[in-house]
Amino acid sequence: MNPNQKIICISATGMTLSVVSLLVGIANLGLNIGLHYKVGDTPNVNIPNVNGTNSTTTIINNNTQNNFTNITNIIQSKGGERTFLNLTKPLCEVNSWHILSKDNAIRIGEDAHILVTREPYLSCDPQGCRMFALSQGTTLRGRHANGTIHDRSPFRALISWEMGQAPSPYNTRVECIGWSSTSCHDGMSRMSICMSGPNNNASAVVWYGGRPITEIPSWAGNILRTQESECVCHKGVCPVVMTDGPANNRAATKIIYFKEGKIQKIEELAGNAQHIEECSCYGAGGVIKCICRDNWKGANRPVITIDPEMMTHTSKYLCSKVLTDTSRPNDPTNGNCDAPITGGSPDPGVKGFAFLDGENSWLGRTISKDSRSGYEMLKVPNAETDIQSGPISNQVIVNNQNWSGYSGAFIDYWANKECFNPCFYVELIRGRPKESSVLWTSNSIVALCGSKKRLGSWSWHDGAEIIYFE
């Protein structure tokens, strides 16, 4: 090849490479423009909710493989804003209960860093449901687990974690510090309340939106305490039941109405209920009902009915002859709507719940009438109003060969249904005092929700072998 031919060949090659480079550049530019303007075709992105007027959220996606940065501006309109929860829907019809979640915390804790907890519950928000409990500030295998049978210490805190997981130092967040708690979401943000301090001068701190808003001092100097399960909000108003005073005599109970963590109204307990502790509350049809524990006298549970719009309440006892506290006597021939039914030993009571909805009413109780073992759900039509109402069906949740504990109500109020589906949890206590070969007291959780279908029973017990911890 002569010199001229070489020059022509090199020039042609150079021109070809230039054209190819130009085409690649044009394609790259087109790709960038296409990705920029086709926001509607991108995958769903979790965009923070903004409670103000229209705002701009900027998302920067770095794609190192293609060596470009794509900056996308997404305009959020008022249509995407949150609103306060409205409790106008009725309860769903329930014919049985389906499993929702079981964390197996004790079983997993035999070989993992699982926190010692008690007084657990579940609570939902617009994004989903989380598990809550009062941590003891130590793990099952930690040396500080010795002595965690005690309810009140400076080391306890209300923690929450993703539903279905076991609580560990790595997946939990602290909601507030204390040894008694309640928490609920009003549709805009979460309110959490924790009690802490010495028995004779405890106080409550009310958190809203992740910040402390209100403090409440003790009013009777005897273990200021609250629900140990979720509160419920309606149009921004969140009533909470608190008690201060003796556990075995008349105490001072108040219903405190909060909005955005600030007190709107305080009511002294009114009605026939003589002692109130550890209420399990739910809302439907614009009304909030709290089924509580009479630790002084009653084996029948007190019921507080709250009108959150008027900020008023009444109280009475569950009328049914089916007694649901533990310990309790045998079910009598007739119930009592206006006074406690006494009897039962040795335990004065346990936290429990019910869903009271006419023919669609369900009561939960331990299978044993003397100890916190086993758990069953009983369908008892008109249990709230009929002194002769009895069960027409039942479902075993935990068999009587296994320990249960506290139980309580919750509802996913943001589920896409035409009614509010009742749900409940059962605390599965392990360790002391019943199993004294270990130094700790802790629990796992099982949660179930209502089904219109008629499903079978099974025992959802804790399942940990205590011998593995010895």
Curated annotation (Swiss-Prot):
Gene Ontology molecular function, alphabetical: exo-alpha-sialidase activity; metal ion binding
Record region (Head of neuraminidase): 91-470
Main localization of the protein described in the UniProt heading: virion
Entry binding sites for substrate: R118, R152, E277, E278, R293, R372
Protein name stated in the entry: Neuraminidase
One GO CC term, this protein: host cell plasma membrane
Reaction(s) this enzyme catalyzes, per UniProt: Hydrolysis of alpha-(2->3)-, alpha-(2->6)-, alpha-(2->8)- glycosidic linkages of terminal sialic acid residues in oligosaccharides, glycoproteins, glycolipids, colominic acid and synthetic substrates
Gene giving rise to this polypeptide: NA
InterPro entries for this protein: Glyco_hydro_34, Sialidase_sf
Subunit structure: Homotetramer.
Gene3D superfamilies: 2.120.10.10
Domain of life (superkingdom): Viruses
Role noted for this protein: Catalyzes the removal of terminal sialic acid residues from viral and cellular glycoconjugates. Cleaves off the terminal sialic acids on the glycosylated HA during virus budding to facilitate virus release. Additionally helps virus spread through the circulation by further removing sialic acids from the cell surface. These cleavages prevent self-aggregation and ensure the efficient spread of the progeny virus from cell to cell. Otherwise, infection would be limited to one round of replication.
Regulation: Inhibited by the neuraminidase inhibitors zanamivir (Relenza) and oseltamivir (Tamiflu). These drugs interfere with the release of progeny virus from infected cells and are effective against all influenza strains. Resistance to neuraminidase inhibitors is quite rare.
TM stretches of this protein: 7-27
Record PTM: N-glycosylated.
Glycan attachment positions: N51, N54, N62, N67, N70, N86, N146, N201, N402
Binding site for Ca(2+): D294, G298, D325, P348
Co-factor: note: Binds 1 Ca(2+) ion per subunit.
